[in-house]
Design a protein with these regions (language model features):
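Short, small-residue-enriched loops and turns at beta-alpha junctions
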Residues: 64-67, 92-96, 174, 191
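Conserved post-catalytic alpha-helical subdomain immediately downstream of the catalytic base
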Residues: 195, 205-247
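Glycine/small-residue-rich loop that forms an oxyanion/phosphate-binding "nest" at active or ligand-binding sites
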Residues: 68-117
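Glycine-rich phosphate/adenosyl-contacting loop at the front of the ribokinase-like
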Residues: 1-40
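Charged C-terminal helix
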Residues: 229-272
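Active-site cofactor/substrate anionic-group-binding motifs, chiefly glycine-
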Residues: 30, 34-83, 88
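Short pre-catalytic strand/loop immediately N-terminal to key active-site residues, enriched for Gly-Thr
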Residues: 185-195
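Conserved phosphate/ATP/ADP-binding segment of small-molecule kinases
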Residues: 100-181
């Protein structure tokens, strides 16, 4: 994991993000904090050109409209042609027909190296389930110690079915390519009270992927550990009278200051 982080800092990859309007600034700042460079371009007239300049692509369906849907398809196909690493964040899949249809359509036309979402979003894509609570996972879908084996089986099965690395994030994170799985226990409950920590993680994963294309599974796991560890560190640095807004900044600060050694020491994971 140390090497994955150090590669991001050394290579400083340019990551193209077609993301949502709610969290776009935080996504850009997290990518900068880890040592990569973000660009946010979503007009159909330039997305293919911008994608050509970058090493990675992060597609997030959080705030959809017909213009950005077209841009996502164009950018995704261009990135595939260039053999760039691509991540799909199917925000709110299962919450509306448009979101589910858009995510499935993208998956049909574009090969994604990583799909990152909560359990409810992934179930919506895999099973047609509609248990998503807005953009959050339904309580019934949370990965817990008591259902961990069942969820690991589900994650591995659909990573193989989708032909991708699947990152299911929540209280316990699962990262798998269908064969090998990382069970990650970094992070804290307070992170769920801040808008966009999932979107930030998708940006972070995209940066790690772009810098570690030959070691994709470990790169995704390392980014996931880094985000959770930053949440833990940020929480520990909060002072009396500081709340959500400060905590968001503390997380970004922790990412910007994180060393490879700190990540290696603080990462909490097991391989199944």
């Amino acid at each position: 994991m140390k090497e994955c982080l150090e590669n991001v800092r050394r290579k400083a990859p340019l990551v193209h993000n077609i993301t949502n309007y709610v969290t776009v600034n935080d996504v850009a700042n997290v990518i900068l904090a880890i040592g990569a460079s973000p660009i946010m371009a979503d007009d159909r007239e330039e997305v293919e050109e911008i994608t050509s300049l970058c090493e990675g692509l992060n597609i997030n369906i959080g705030t959809l409209n017909q213009r950005t849907i077209e841009a996502m398809h164009l950018a995704g196909k261009k990135a595939n042609a260039l053999q760039h690493k691509i991540l799909l964040d199917p925000v709110g899949a299962g919450a509306s027909a448009l979101r589910t249809k858009t995510a499935l359509s993208l998956m049909e036309e574009v090969h994604f190296d990583v799909i990152r979402g909560n359990v409810s979003e992934v179930k919506a894509l895999a099973l047609g389930s509609q248990s998503t609570k807005g953009v959050d996972a339904d309580a019934a879908d949370v990965v817990r110690e008591e259902n961990l084996q069942k969820m690991l089986f589900f994650a591995k099965k659909y990573a193989q079915s989708f032909g991708t690395i699947l990152a299911i994030t929540g209280a316990i994170d699962l990262v798998t390519d269908g064969e090998k799985a990382y069970v990650i226990r970094n992070g804290c409950q307070e992170m769920s009270r801040i808008t966009g920590t999932g979107c930030q993680l998708s940006g972070l994963i995209s940066a790690f992927l772009a810098a570690n294309p030959e070691n994709a599974l470990e790169a995704v796991a390392a980014a996931t550990c880094a985000m959770g560890l930053a949440g833990e560190i940020g929480k520990g640095r909060l002072l009396e009278g500081e709340g959500n807004a400060t905590y968001r900044n503390r997380i970004i600060d922790a990412i910007s200051l994180m060393t490879g050694e700190e990540l290696e020491k603080g990462a909490k994971y097991e391989i199944r």
